[in-house]
Amino acid sequence: MEKITDKVFGGERPLFEIHNVELDHVRITFGESGIKECSNIVCRNCYFEGKYPLWHVKGSDIRNCYFAPGSRSAIWYSDDMHMEDCVINGPKFFREMKNLSLKNVTINDADETFWGIDGLKLENVVLHEGTYPFMHCRNIKVDGLQSDAKYVFQYSRDIEIRNAKIDTKDSFWEVDNVTVYDSELNGEFLGWHSRGLRLVNCHISGEQPLCYAKDLVIENCTFDPECDRAFEYSTLQADIRGHIKSIKNPTSGRIVADSIGEVIIDENIKQPADCQILTR
């Protein structure tokens, strides 16, 4: 493998069509498409500040690198990538990719990041700011995620999440086949219009959670006092630990809690209107 060390590249496409190359302490300055149409690329201790630095790259390993705010839309259409111990300050990262893994990565502008990814693995990843991360993704595994970005995991499917802390409203909308373990989910309107959403050993806060959900499963979860009007028009099986403030018009299934503040069943309930609501 060829090695390029302590070099600076700028302008347009300075490293176009390179293959089997390691870049060490390389700086990609202002310009566009620094590393494009490449394969088998290793980046160590590199600094990226130009736009679109890694497009159409097949097979890459990126470690201890920094992506400046100017490196927007940095990594699109690049498959089989591993990134570790990196900091990202640019928006719109990671689009239309297959087999992407991140470990110990902080993304400080997560705006429109992770769109259209098939095969995503995250370990100890932090997301800040921005809107709609993880849009239209599939086959995701997460162990360790902290996120205050808005509207995460919408229109995505086949997801397993462990040890996450997610702070936003409107998370997990229109998802399909998602299981979340041992996590804290904070924000109103959680999981609306979801299909096959399963929450295990989670703590949930925010108003009107888990409405319009189909085949919702809740196992050994707790709810903050602010969680009112839960489960409206949802079909579900729920095992709730502790108290839940209020439940409104669930469509079908079974809900068990230690205590329930209020059950609202009115003329607007949808059929079959046969949900069992029980206290221990």
Give, region by region, the residue ranges found by the protein language model.
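Long, distal/terminal scaffolding or interaction modules
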Residues: 1-280
